[in-house]
Each structure stands twice: as structure tokens, then as C-alpha cells.
């Protein structure tokens, strides 16, 4: 079960950071595992919103940090900026509520996932993604029980998803070494 928790956290962060700007590009069998907040963010995007996000994503390497990217978004579309900030604040509040060990673990996951973001014009390297998931799982298993329980309590939807048999099959299949 711990493997699936980490993979779901990894998938959630990836979805929030590198997912296509249309939910229709995501295979049906994976849509149910996307966090509701991410789905809500994408649900009401207009074609113009999607285009703005595509343009900003294509320039991701030029932004020093998340704040710089948000500032560029604000200069382009205040409405879209507000939606992005709302999603960011939701996630940030959850992370900030964690005790130091759990917070450090989540921060490490986020940094690892950001490092996986492909360069402009490149595709996501699935082998690097699988290795990152394996590394994160190993670190998760090294956490004490109290920290694991805190992560489960703070991210209850993730816990609900990881107990899903379909998700377990997909996660185990995904992590198989080729």
C-alpha cells in the first residue's frame, strides 16, 4: 500500500505541474486518479485559457521560480491567475500544515518531480519517472509510522484512491522494470 501512496502523490504532483492543458488528452483509465482540485482547475478552462497555459509552459525554463511564472500568468490573464493561485494556495496550505519530517518528505517529492520536467520540445522520460517513483517509495518506507499516518490524514483523498484495486494494478504495472 505504501508504494501506491507514493506513486499517487507523485502522479498528483505531476498532473499539477506537467499534465496536458486538456483533460481529454489523459487516458480514461487514469482520469479517476487525478486529484479533484486539479480536475476543477481544468474543468472550466476556455480555449484562450488553454492557449495561454501552453504558451507559458513552453517558456517554463525562463522562469526563475513558481512566483515568476505566476506573475507572467497574471500579466496575461488575471482570471486564470486567480484560479492558479487558488489551486496553489490549497496545496501549499496542506503542505504547510505538516510537521517537519512529513513536510520535508513532500518538499523532496516536489523537487524531484520538478527535476523530471522535460526540456522544451522533449517528452517526459518514463524511465526517469519510474526511477524517481522507486526512489520516493524507498524514502517513504524509511519514514516512521507517525509521519506516514500524518501524510495519510493530510491527504485523505490519496488514501481513498490508493485502496482502489484498479489503481493498485495500474501502479504495479507502471513500476515494473523493463
From Swiss-Prot:
It comes from the Eukaryota. InterPro entries: Gp-FAR-1. It comes from Onchocerca dukei (Filarial nematode worm). The gene is far-1. Residues 67-89, 122-154 form a coiled coil. One of its GO terms (cellular component) is extracellular region. Keywords: Coiled coil, Glycoprotein, Lipid-binding, Retinol-binding, Secreted, Signal, Vitamin A. N-glycosylated. It is found in: Secreted. Its main location: secreted. This is Fatty-acid and retinol-binding protein 1. One of its GO terms (molecular function) is fatty acid binding. Residues 1-16 form the signal peptide. Belongs to the fatty-acid and retinol-binding protein (FARBP) family. Binds retinol and different fatty acids. Glycans are attached at residues 44, 75, 157.
Amino acid at each position: 500500500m505504501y508504494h501506491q501512496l507514493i506513486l499517487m502523490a507523485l502522479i498528483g504532483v505531476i498532473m499539477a505541474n506537467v499534465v496536458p492543458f486538456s483533460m481529454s488528452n489523459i487516458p480514461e483509465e487514469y482520469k479517476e486518479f487525478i486529484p479533484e482540485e486539479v480536475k476543477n482547475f481544468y474543468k472550466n478552462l476556455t480555449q484562450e485559457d488553454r492557449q495561454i497555459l501552453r504558451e507559458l509552459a513552453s517558456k517554463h525554463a525562463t522562469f526563475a521560480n513558481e512566483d515568476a511564472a505566476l506573475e507572467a500568468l497574471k500579466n496575461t490573464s488575471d482570471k486564470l491567475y486567480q484560479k492558479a493561485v487558488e489551486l496553489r494556495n490549497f496545496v501549499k496550505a496542506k503542505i504547510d500544515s505538516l510537521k517537519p519530517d512529513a513536510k520535508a518528505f513532500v518538499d523532496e517529492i516536489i523537487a524531484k518531480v520538478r527535476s523530471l520536467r522535460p526540456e522544451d520540445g522533449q517528452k517526459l522520460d518514463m524511465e526517469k519517472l519510474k526511477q524517481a517513483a522507486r526512489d520516493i517509495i524507498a524514502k517513504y518506507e524509511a519514514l516512521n509510522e507517525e509521519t506516514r499516518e500524518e501524510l495519510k490524514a493530510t491527504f485523505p483523498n490519496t488514501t481513498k484512491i490508493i485502496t482502489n484495486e484498479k489503481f493498485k494494478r495500474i501502479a504495479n504495472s507502471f513500476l515494473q522494470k523493463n
